[in-house]
Design a protein with these regions (language model features):
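VWA/integrin I-like adhesion module and closely mimicked acidic/polar interface patches used
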Residues: 187-242
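Bacterial signal peptide processing site
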Residues: 20, 26-28
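P/S/T/G-enriched low-complexity
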Residues: 51, 230-266
Length: 266
């Protein structure tokens, strides 16, 4: 169909305004990559005032109910841990059972960010607004990552790839104030120490036996005394496994870190 001169003029103006091809212009919506990183007061990896949050999500499936549960629990925890804190870095990895691959969430890559108000150097209202924009944007990015993840049910519930992946992230951004949020229901179909033949007959004793088996075989990555909060325990599409899920979380938590706690979240 032949386009009118007016339509061509409008298209050209739109492309010029974007300084990129028209197709690329559509992708330049809200971008969280620069929020909090332009300030001369941005925190560094050696800044003890900066908090480093590492989010690890072992997603059992990507139904909307599961995604909503994960997003609500994770962000309630992040907001609680960063309440009143304006200098921090957020790192997030998602594992869905695809080999050992962990997907890093856009704008949650460990970049140090500062939303600190400094009199005479920046605007307090803008700092607060950008901090909120950053959280809102990363929340959407995380939701999109979870919704588009491809799952391998044969290895679901194996959170260990996330723990191994997190070690490098913790080292890179270690400020002395690192907190790890691990979301998993621990209901694994693994073939090694995590193999659970009859989860329906699970018990605290069996959960402890499985966790110890992994530890004895040196198949359980540990995080020393890093602050670790476990979410997702008791969650599953099979409600009969809820109790065993919680028992597994408790058994593994105390072996992952000496400073680990299990929380149901909200």
């Amino acid at each position: 169909m032949k386009r009118s001169p007016l339509s061509l003029l409008v298209a050209a103006a739109f492309s010029f305004a974007c300084c990129t091809p028209i197709a690329a212009c559509e992708q330049q919506s809200a971008d969280c990559s620069e929020l909090g990183v332009n300030s001369s007061n941005a925190p560094t990896s050696t800044n003890a005032q900066s908090t480093n949050i590492v989010v690890l999500i072992d997603l059992p499936n990507n139904t909307q109910d599961t995604i909503d549960k994960v997003i609500n629990q994770v962000y309630n925890t992040i907001e609680h841990q960063l309440d009143g804190i304006t200098e921090f870095s957020l790192t997030a990895g998602v594992y869905t059972g695809q080999s050992n691959n962990v997907t890093t969430v856009t704008c949650m890559d460990g970049t140090a960010r500062s939303f600190t108000y400094v009199e005479g150097e920046n605007n307090e209202t803008r700092q607060k607004r950008e901090r909120k924009e950053y959280f809102d944007s990363t929340k959407k990015q995380l939701e999109n990552t979870l919704a588009t993840s491809t799952h391998n049910k044969s290895t679901s519930g194996d959170f260990r790839s996330l723990l191994s992946w997190s070690k490098d992230k913790i080292t890179q951004n270690n400020t002395g104030n690192t907190k790890v949020i691990l979301w998993s229901n621990f209901l694994s179909n693994g073939t090694d120490c995590l193999n659970i033949e009859s989860p329906s007959s699970g018990s605290s004793a069996l959960a402890d036996e499985i966790a110890q088996r992994c530890q004895d075989a040196d198949l359980l990555p540990t995080l020393g005394n890093i602050d670790v909060q476990v979410l997702g325990s008791g969650y599953g599409t099979d409600t009969s496994l809820a109790s065993f899920s919680s028992q597994l979380a408790t058994a593994f938590c105390k072996r992952i870190s000496t400073n680990c706690r299990v929380s149901q979240g909200k």
